Swiss-Prot record:
Xref: PANTHER family: PHOSPHORIBOSYLFORMYLGLYCINAMIDINE SYNTHASE SUBUNIT PURQ
Gene (UniProt): purQ
UniProt keyword list: ATP-binding, Cytoplasm, Glutamine amidotransferase, Hydrolase, Ligase, Nucleotide-binding, Purine biosynthesis
Name of this chain's protein: Phosphoribosylformylglycinamidine synthase subunit PurQ
Quaternary structure, from the entry: Part of the FGAM synthase complex composed of 1 PurL, 1 PurQ and 2 PurS subunits.
Classification via InterPro entries: Class_I_gatase-like, PRibForGlyAmidine_synth_PurQ
Molecular function terms, GO-annotated: ATP binding; glutaminase activity; phosphoribosylformylglycinamidine synthase activity
């Protein structure tokens, strides 16, 4: 099992992700500079949190043009597992691998707190380990409000592609959405940070089972 973590100028959670996947879970993990184009040696790709390219224009808008992401489109089309966390989720929507968009929080403030979450669908491997369907993960974002059209929301519901919802909806996301998958379930994007909840020494392990899904 080999994991690639794509690093953009402005990424700040890539080392956290590598520590979680490699240090905690023993998965061989390499950080991949955004100019690299060969992703063929990886079993899964993670887009980490941060502020890619300073979030200029809007979050993820510039990162979508990175050479590595053009290769990521092909990787995902072949069924490769892709996980986008926080800014990574924003990038996946800009890239078109996931529908909708992430916009400014409803209260216009940066939110940093532990968020109670509910597993909405256990259809995909990402969520199958959460038998109790309730978990808590850290969030830290200023543009995490998930927005989509009514037609897109219906499609997400029809595809059973809403993976996670907020218990208290801190940012005003439509339908309390915290994370979604593509129709096949191979691509997951979420605003909460599972990599920050893998070790009891730093406050919980609710993110661990989600990352273990990278093992297939």
């Amino acid at each position: 099992m080999s994991i690639g973590v794509i690093v953009f100028p402005g990424s700040n959670c890539d080392r956290d992700v590598q520590w979680a996947t490699d240090g905690c879970l023993g998965m061989s993990t390499r950080r991949v500079w955004h100019e690299e184009t060969d992703l063929s040696g990886f079993d899964a790709i993670i887009l980490p949190g941060g502020f890619s390219y300073g979030d200029y224009l809007r979050c993820g808008a510039i990162a979508r043009f990175a050479p590595a992401l053009q290769s990521l489109i092909d990787f995902a089309a072949k069924g490769g597992r892709v996980l986008g966390i926080c800014n990574g989720f924003q990038v996946l929507t800009e890239l078109g691998l996931l529908p909708g968009a992430l916009t400014r929080n409803q209260n216009l403030h940066f939110i940093c707190e532990d968020a109670p979450l509910k597993v909405v669908s256990q259809r995909t491997a990402w969520m199958q380990g959460y038998n109790d369907r309730a978990l808590t993960l850290p969030i830290a974002h200023g543009e995490g409000r998930y927005q989509c059209s009514d037609d897109t929301l219906k499609q997400l519901q029809d595809d059973d592609a809403i993976a996670l919802s907020y218990g208290n909806n801190p940012n005003g996301s439509v339908f309390n959405i915290a994370g979604i998958t593509n129709a096949s379930g191979s691509v997951l994007g979420l605003m909460p940070h599972p990599e920050r909840a893998c070790d009891p020494a730093i406050g919980g392990t609710d993110g661990r089972r989600m990352l273990e899904a990278l093992l297939g």
